[in-house]
Amino acid sequence: CEKIWEKDNYINQIAAIRKSQIDRFKKEKIITVEDLCSINLDNPNFKKINSNALSNLKTKAGLVQKKRETGKSDYIIAETENNKGLYKLPEPNSADVFIDLEGYPFFGKRGFEYLHGLYLNTGTKIEFKYFWANSLNREDETKNFIDLIEYLKKHFDKYPDAFIYHYNDYERRALKDLSNEYSSTFPDGVNLIDKLLRQEKFIDLFRVVEQCMQTSEKDLSLKTIEKFYRKERSAKIKTADDSIRLFDDWCATNDQKF
């Protein structure tokens, strides 16, 4: 289906467009991205679509169409209200933490969190610190979580003005689930996560990007927008799915080369 949609230049190629919006456009014979580029924003038939959303969709359609014609990716930073987009970012702090969790969904009801990765300033240098499960069992997951919480507690005791940055809601949700899961045996976990949530220390960069960045791409995944700020990854693992497959192979073979 995706190949057909791309070939037909169907309007679902625009990032974050909703089904209800697509249905409204189709009633007006707006079927392709190119059609959307030329819509009249004052058309009363589009009044059920928020005017700002309609304008943004037209702008994104122009970027998508331009890439289709030139092969070049592009983006613009849009104006937003004071409480949205880039305005949601706090003042940078040298002790800010950037966190990424990797989970294995095919284990139990809630899956298995096998990797907590942190990128942060330790006071002497910027480094990547990780907590990795050596086997697929809850004991390793528990130890990982305890080690992570103890590390974060020390960090925020030392740097109370720091924030935790993540991309999309997975990390915040997974940490909350883990803290609740182990609250009876490790209350420090739920206490710290609740405290960080109350203090609004978790900054979701996906929401920032979603509200202020309009691109020529079909989605706003981290892998997709990386092309705008870094060179292409040289590592074999490029997506969360790649990581899951590799962890699955590692569990099956216990091959340390992985």
Task: Identify the role of each PLM range.
Residues 1-24, 38, 43-58:
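Long, low-complexity intrinsically disordered regions
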Residues 14, 23-25, 34-35, 106-109, ...:
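Short helix/loop capping segments that flank catalytic or ligand/cofactor-binding pockets
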Residues 28-109:
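Long, highly charged low-complexity segments
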Residues 91-147:
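Metal-dependent catalytic core segments for phosphate chemistry
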Residues 120, 128-244:
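Conserved DEDDh/DEDDy metal-dependent 3′-5′ exonuclease domain
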